[in-house]
From Swiss-Prot:
GO terms for molecular function: ATP binding; metal ion binding; NAD binding; NAD+ kinase activity. Keywords: ATP-binding, Cytoplasm, Kinase, NAD, NADP, Nucleotide-binding, Transferase. NAD(+) binds at D73, G74, N147, E148, H158, R175, D177, T188, A189, Y190, S191, L192, S193, Q247. Its cofactor is a divalent metal cation. It is found in: Cytoplasm. The active site is at D73. Involved in the regulation of the intracellular balance of NAD and NADP, and is a key enzyme in the biosynthesis of NADP. Catalyzes specifically the phosphorylation on 2'-hydroxyl of the adenosine moiety of NAD to yield NADP. This is NAD kinase. Its EC number is 2.7.1.23. GO terms for biological process: NAD metabolic process; NADP biosynthetic process. Belongs to the NAD kinase family.
Length: 292
């Protein structure tokens, strides 16, 4: 064992027995190598582990040096919103579909992870968005997002009329099905499907992507990540929502605005030493291949 990491947390909500097997193999492998291991409570219960140190996501964030998320991108997003609040590094083993954020191949995870534990890794700081639903600047509901904050109708699809202010200066108005406000991390997710640009992870930028705008001139807009975005609504309705990473929904009531800004904290995401963002674009999303 080395001194790069002492306590390692195992997190992620398994959707099938294969993923659960990966959790168990990882736990026993780390214990055999002499690491202190914390297991998320739900995983420990499902594996029926005895005499194991367990904790919530927050407790793992407070006590562990590294969190290994086993699952797909959804598992990573759910865990990352909590773990980003703490001084902990995060890496993922892919047991989902795409696995854009979970780098490690489950069939070769032990060797890749061994290299990471020896200190051979690439570190990135990924910023989050904070979304507030407020009335007269009095905060009412708040959440965070790694990928994106999306304005959309609640249950029935319909046109929304709204205004967008950037740093309290009017930017544009729009009639559309909604708006995607994305981080660079989220630029390869929902934003990409809506025609948004790909932003490399190190950019300090936020992209605003219209969803089915009722105009021929609407285009995605890229702004500085230090900007504050305010959404105001002209026709008051009680069925609008914002969703964070497609996992948390906040309702918007009549007379309320939405404020979106960069979080004060960030996610410490790490990758194997041979990680390449552009190779990931190619292998996961079919980005153009080399010609020679």
């Amino acid at each position: 064992m080395n001194n790069h990491f002492k306590c390692i947390g195992i997190v992620g909500h398994p959707r099938h027995p294969t993923a659960l097997t990966t959790h168990e193999m990882l736990y026993r492998w780390l214990c055999a190598k002499g690491y202190e291991v914390m297991v998320e409570q739900q995983i420990a219960q499902e594996l029926q582990l005895k005499n194991v140190k367990t904790g919530t996501l927050a407790e793992i964030g407070q006590q562990a040096d590294l969190a290994v998320v086993v699952g797909g991108d959804g598992n990573m997003l759910g865990a990352a919103r909590t773990l980003a609040r703490y001084d902990i590094k995060v890496i993922g083993i892919n047991r989902g579909n795409l696995g854009f954020l979970t780098d490690l191949d489950p069939d070769n995870a032990h060797q890749q992870l061994a290299d990471v534990l020896d200190g051979h890794y690439i570190s990135e700081k990924r910023f989050l968005l904070e979304a507030q639903v407020c009335q007269q600047d009095c905060q009412k509901r708040i959440s965070t997002a790694i990928n994106e904050v999306v304005l959309h109708p609640g249950k029935v699809a319909h046109m929304i009329e709204f205004e967008v202010y950037i740093d309290e200066v009017f930017a544009f108005s729009q009639r559309s099905d909604g708006l995607i406000i994305s981080t660079p991390t989220g630029s390869t997710a929902y934003s990409l499907s809506a025609g948004g640009p790909i932003l490399t992870p190190s950019l300090d930028a936020i992209t605003l992507v219209p969803m089915f705008p009722h105009t021929l001139s609407a285009r995605p807009l890229v702004i500085n990540s230090s900007s504050t975005i305010r959404l105001r609504f002209s026709h008051r309705r009680n069925d609008l929502e914002i969703s964070c990473d497609s996992q948390i929904a906040l309702p918007i009531q009549e007379g309320e605005d939405v404020l979106i800004r960069r979080c004060d904290y960030h996610l410490n995401l790490i990758h194997p030493k041979d990680y390449s963002y552009f190779n990931t674009l190619s292998s996961k999303l079919g980005w153009s291949k080399k010609l020679f």
